[in-house]
UniProtKB/Swiss-Prot annotation:
UniProt-listed NCBIfam families: PRK00132.1
Lineage of the species this protein comes from: Bacteria, Pseudomonadati, Pseudomonadota, Gammaproteobacteria, Aeromonadales
Similarity section: Belongs to the universal ribosomal protein uS9 family.
Keyword Protein biosynthesis attributed: no
Highest taxon in the source lineage: Bacteria
Pfam families assigned to the protein according to its UniProt record, in alphabetical order: Ribosomal_S9
Cellular component per GO, a single term: cytosolic small ribosomal subunit
Gene3D superfamilies: 3.30.230.10
Full protein name: Small ribosomal subunit protein uS9
């Protein structure tokens, strides 16, 4: 596709994001839609921009992202993880700064499975003494 393109895969909960970075003007495209169109919530938009703002490259790079699975917060987290990995491929010196902010580590928390005999993962039926 492009000669200087960097790639990163991000995951969070059940979402997976594929992030492609190349030099540009700061355009972010997620599943053929703009960041503002894709994420209505300002918090999700903020999460996506965090790694770029940390390394001050918001206006220097164009991002092309495909994301699937999960909900809004999981997808935002997956995109953030993917952007971080792509930035590290772009410039390895950014790793220490991104690691310090906690963006390099994959958030391993997932939904706990429902257990037999319980209403939810941990919610027990009401206890009756008599």
């Amino acid at each position: 596709m492009a000669e200087n393109q960097y790639y990163g895969t991000g995951r969070r909960k059940s979402s997976t994001a594929r992030v492609f970075i190349k030099a540009g003007s700061g355009k972010i495209v997620i599943n053929q839609r703009s960041l503002e169109q894709y994420f209505g919530r300002p918090t999700a938009r903020m999460v996506v921009r965090q790694p770029l703002e940390l390394v001050e490259m918001t206006e220097k790079l164009d991002l092309y992202i495909t994301v699937n699975g999960g909900g809004i917060s999981g997808q935002a987290g997956a995109i953030r993880h993917g952007i971080t990995r792509a930035l590290m491929q772009y410039d390895e010196t950014l790793r220490a700064e991104l690691r310090k902010a906690g963006f390099v580590t994959r958030d391993a928390r997932k939904v706990e499975r429902k257990k037999v005999g319980l209403h939810k993962a941990r919610k027990r039926p009401q206890y009756s003494k008599r």
